[in-house]
Amino acid sequence: MEISRQFVRQKNPCTDGFRWFMRHFQEGSDYQPLLDALVAAGRVSDACWLMDQFGPTKAVLEVDALEAEAVVFAGSLLVRGPIEVDSVLRIGGSLRAESGIRVGRRLQLGADLWAAGNVRSLGSLHVDGDVRADWNLLVGERLDCGGDLRVGWDVEVGTECTIGGQTAVGGDVAVGAALK
């Protein structure tokens, strides 16, 4: 998807973000390279805003492991090893991890989450679809699950927990505030 100057302007971006876009991409850019450039420049919130405006893609990325400060990917992601992200992991589609997931601040997905190990977000976890963690699910702040929640062992949520579908947990459940 080509993102032009006019296309971005129609979405009413912040002045600083639009100036950055014009300095770096005067002729426009493809969607994912623009998201990557924003993240590399430390403009993670701008990359998330852009994804809010333009939505997910059907792209699928497969990697052996993922270790980064922040990741914003518009498609779906398959990771064969561990995932370690210091701040934000934002995926437009689904995330499948054949190991554990650790995110420092926020984990947000536009579809389903499946992890063969622990899922740990020190901040919030927002998943529009189903969540499946074969081990523990540990969320430091708020959990929003739009679909079913299936966890092999324990669930621990620091504040509020909202689940849109059915819940199956193999161990204990601890929620710091309301469970909806």
Residue ranges and their predicted role:
Residues 1-180:
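Short, glycine-biased loop/turn motifs at secondary-structure junctions and
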